From Swiss-Prot:
This is Alpha-amanitin proprotein 2. Pfam families: Amanitin. It comes from Galerina marginata (strain CBS 339.88). The typical symptoms of amatoxin poisoning are gastro-intestinal distress beginning 6-12 hours after ingestion, a remission phase lasting 12-24 hours, and progressive loss of liver function culminating in death within 3-5 days. One of the few effective treatments is liver transplantation. The keyword Glycoprotein does not apply. The gene is AMA1-2. The modification 4-hydroxyproline is found at P18.
Amino acid sequence: MFDTNSTRLPIWGIGCNPWTAEHVDQTLVSGNDIC
């Protein structure tokens, strides 16, 4: 669940909706913005 992208989670969490780590990971892979 928490891999190399785990470092991005705190950054994405700021000013964005509180998504789960798995959802954020899938979003980053998809290349879509969650904000």
